[in-house]
A protein has these predicted regions:
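Short, positively charged patches
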Residues: 1-125
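Generic beta-strand structural signal
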Residues: 88, 102-104, 131-133, 154-155
């Protein structure tokens, strides 16, 4: 919850990761002023003011809309933690156990041709459901990859960068 609150108060994902990394090296609990300084935020006073102005009951309600896990949790995918600017907090819906299986990422154009969709279908069929298909949920190649996997009895993970309750 605290990571979510930091984000809502204005820290970027990278600033939160910096704070979490620093926090691992000290034995005492960090004060909000320390967090503002360590994070490198542009205006610590504004961050702290926003933090204290947050309605905790409302934010908690918003936070509880979907289950989540953070980069500090054991279920956080190791391979995701190795990328630059790994998401500090992820919300999910569905089977979290799919993260434990070998995966293949599929990325492509939102305006794919019928040939592109057929190519994705062929590649996914060739995987013979040995890998979990990971892709966005945008139209085009992303959707074609998910559909091909599901039509062939496979499993998928959809990554939505905007959040589970934001539609575009």
């Amino acid at each position: 919850y605290e990571i979510y609150k930091f984000r809502k108060a204005g820290l970027t994902n990278q600033q939160i990761l910096t704070v979490l990394e620093y926090d691992e090296t000290v034995d005492q609990e960090l004060l909000l002023g320390d967090i503002a300084e360590i994070s490198g935020c542009r205006n610590p006073a504004v961050f702290m003011e926003r933090y204290f102005q947050i309605d905790d009951a409302q934010l908690e309600k918003e936070f509880q809309k979907f289950p989540s896990f953070s980069i500090l949790d054991d279920c956080y995918p190791w391979d995701l933690s190795e990328i630059y600017d790994a998401p500090a907090l992820l919300f999910y819906k569905g089977n979290l156990d799919l993260l434990k299986f070998p995966k293949v990422a599929v990325v492509g154009s939102r305006s794919c041709s019928s040939q592109g969709a057929k190519s994705v279908q062929k590649v996914i069929q060739g995987l013979e459901n040995e890998l979990i298909v990971v892709s966005g949920l945008a139209k085009g190649i992303d959707t074609a990859a998910h559909m091909a996997a599901l039509q062939n009895g496979g499993r998928t993970i959809a990554v939505i960068g905007t959040g589970l309750d934001v539609f575009y």
